[in-house]
From Swiss-Prot:
It comes from Homo sapiens. Residues 1-22 form the signal peptide. This is Prostaglandin-H2 D-isomerase. Changing F83A: Reduces enzyme activity about five-fold. It is found in: Rough endoplasmic reticulum; Nucleus membrane; Golgi apparatus; Cytoplasm, Perinuclear region. Monomer. Abundant in the brain and CNS, where it is expressed in tissues of the blood-brain barrier and secreted into the cerebro-spinal fluid. Abundantly expressed in the heart. In the male reproductive system, it is expressed in the testis, epididymis and prostate, and is secreted into the seminal fluid. Expressed in the eye and secreted into the aqueous humor. Lower levels detected in various tissue fluids such as serum, normal urine, ascitic fluid and tear fluid. Also found in a number of other organs including ovary, fimbriae of the fallopian tubes, kidney, leukocytes. N- and O-glycosylated. Both N-glycosylation recognition sites are almost quantitatively occupied by N-glycans of the biantennary complex type, with a considerable proportion of structures bearing a bisecting GlcNAc. N-glycan at Asn-78: dHex1Hex5HexNAc4. Agalacto structure as well as sialylated and nonsialylated oligosaccharides bearing alpha2-3- and/or alpha2-6-linked NeuNAc are present. It catalyses: prostaglandin H2 = prostaglandin D2. Disulfide bonds join C89-C186. The active site is at C65 (nucleophile). Glycans are attached at S29, N51, N78. Gene3D superfamilies: 2.40.128.20. GO terms for molecular function: fatty acid binding; prostaglandin-D synthase activity; retinoid binding.
Length: 190
């Protein structure tokens, strides 16, 4: 009887370990010595990856958007994005509140009522930034998203390769990674 119980426990443990190995990393690193003042200014969303079904459903209709990062009064960041939706420019602002180390923020979604962590994983401040967001939309609905921001509308091929490698390391598959096409709409200063 003890041998039978041990066998089942061993199989259960192997199953748990197998799931742990297959799961994407829950923690991502943050840009060392993150300098928030250098991160401010205009960025373009050049790439996205997400485990959310909306990306697969809407990715053909998505296009690049312009985002402006400005300091918030609480030491966090205001991330204001302007994008094309139903042939009109729409603007949304997210307040990223400081959450621990520099480069780590939290965001409370008014739509979902959930709080997400947002990390600046890597940036050179002049050309690109890799951001990673994670949280939960509800019970059992984990949400993960990686974003490639570029200072220009035409990021270099090496940056796209870097973003793809980062996404795959986080468990995203090719069909969940999209590079957003350029658009002339909603990109001018307003």
């Amino acid at each position: 009887m003890a041998t039978h119980h041990t066998l089942w426990m061993g199989l259960a443990l192997l199953g748990v370990l197998g799931d742990l190995q297959a799961a994407p990393e829950a923690q991502v690193s943050v840009q060392p010595n993150f300098q928030q003042d250098k991160f401010l200014g205009r960025w373009f969303s050049a790439g996205l990856a997400s485990n959310s079904s909306w990306l697969r459903e809407k990715k053909a209709a998505l296009s690049m958007c312009k985002s402006v990062v400005a300091p918030a009064t609480d030491g966090g960041l205001n991330l204001t994005s302007t994008f094309l939706r139903k042939n009109q420019c729409e603007t949304r602002t997210m307040l990223l509140q400081p959450a621990g180390s520099l480069g780590s923020y939290s965001y409370r979604s008014p739509h979902w009522g959930s709080t997400y962590s947002v990390s600046v994983v890597e940036t050179d401040y002049d050309q690109y930034a890799l951001l990673y967001s994670q949280g939960s939309k509800g019970p059992g609905e984990d949400f993960r998203m990686a974003t490639l921001y570029s200072r220009t509308q035409t990021p270099r091929a090496e940056l796209k390769e870097k973003f793809t490698a980062f996404c795959k390391a986080q468990g995203f598959t090719e069909d969940t990674i999209v590079f957003l096409p350029q658009t002339d709409k909603c990109m001018t200063e307003q």
